[in-house]
């Protein structure tokens, strides 16, 4: 802890050396010394002026102040300050720090982060004809609020984690109590607690560190930008990983059949959605096995084809310098 105001200011100044956006404002109070610390553009200047600085200047006598910031400041998000590292982390997160010196030094952390991101808009990757036109944004608080607006139950829970020793990115694990599979939930908690990455900038970074098989060809987590799709997966018993700063939400566990599903399926009738998914799966099997079937019939079992059909194929391939296998391989690689 800090002995006096000078040691506090010097300690914070040394941490934020060569940081021109670090602001330390000293206030002239009756009976006390006070400072307000912020990081420019991270904290809301109007909120700090109205809810922090103005009430402090309006108080006539500070000599009897003993740390009751809630009775002075007009803010509902006030926490007690800790050591220098905790205060520095709070400042970087957009909070304001108030220090008042009377009989001893009292420190408070006020949540005053300023949001500078885009508003809710249409998704850019998963465009649908029917259904909601809103998508997730880069603000984790807005994303959680939008999910709560759809899944209106107190059983919707989430656990916050801080990942990245340098970035300290907030990641939330969301699930519905009673619906989510407990083994999946415990496995996700264990993965998030066991990893110690240096930098987390996007949900793609979270996907990499939570991948069970590092060299596996199939993904272990899904990704969606659509709010109603994420809500439907929550109700179906899935878990969500929401990363602050990313408009894409990770879903787990991810099964192979989800690759043939669309966000629009969740707003269609069950019969129609099942039929369309069956068509997608059939088209996948057709694209997978049709080249092999063509190679087998033409190269190894020409007697299974009608003679006139095989004659046409043979004449068309007479001037091609590569084999049918090489031709099909090139076609599959290119398309």
Identify the residue ranges that each predicted region occupies:
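Core alpha-helical transmembrane segments of integral membrane proteins
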Residues: 264, 270-335
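Membrane-embedded alpha-helical signal segments
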Residues: 1-289, 307
């Amino acid at each position: 802890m800090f002995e006096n105001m000078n040691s506090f200011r010097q300690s914070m100044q040394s941490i934020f050396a060569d940081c021109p956006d670090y602001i330390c404002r000293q206030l002239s109070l009756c009976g006390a010394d006070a400072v307000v610390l912020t990081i420019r553009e991270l904290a809301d200047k109007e909120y700090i002026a109205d809810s922090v600085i103005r009430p402090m200047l309006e108080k006539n006598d500070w000599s009897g102040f003993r740390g009751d910031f809630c009775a002075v400041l007009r803010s509902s998000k006030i926490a007690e300050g800790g050591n220098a590292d905790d205060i520095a982390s709070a400042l970087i997160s957009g909070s304001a720090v108030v220090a008042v010196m009377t009989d001893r030094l009292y420190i408070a952390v006020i949540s005053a982060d300023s949001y500078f991101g885009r508003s809710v808009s249409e998704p850019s990757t998963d465009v649908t004809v029917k259904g909601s036109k809103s998508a997730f944004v880069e603000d984790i608080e807005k994303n959680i609020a939008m999910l709560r607006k759809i899944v209106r139950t107190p059983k919707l829970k989430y656990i916050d984690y801080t990942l990245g020793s340098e970035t300290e990115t907030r990641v939330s694990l969301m699930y519905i109590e009673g619906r989510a599979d407990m083994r999946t939930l415990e496995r996700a908690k264990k993965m998030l607690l066991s990893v110690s990455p240096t930098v987390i900038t996007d949900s793609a970074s979270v996907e990499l560190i939570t991948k069970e098989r590092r060299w596996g060809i199939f993904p272990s987590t899904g990704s969606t930008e659509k709010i109603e799709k994420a809500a439907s997966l929550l109700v179906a018993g899935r878990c969500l990983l929401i990363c602050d700063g990313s408009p894409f939400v990770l879903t787990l566990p991810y099964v192979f059949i989800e690759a043939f599903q669309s966000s629009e399926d969740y707003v269609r009738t069950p019969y129609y959605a099942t039929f369309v998914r069956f068509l997608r799966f059939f088209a996948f099997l057709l694209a997978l096995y049709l080249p092999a079937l063509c190679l087998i019939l033409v190269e190894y079992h020409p007697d299974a084809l009608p003679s006139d059909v095989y004659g046409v194929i043979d004449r068309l391939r007479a001037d091609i310098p590569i084999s049918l296998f090489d031709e099909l391989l090139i076609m599959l690689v290119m398309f």
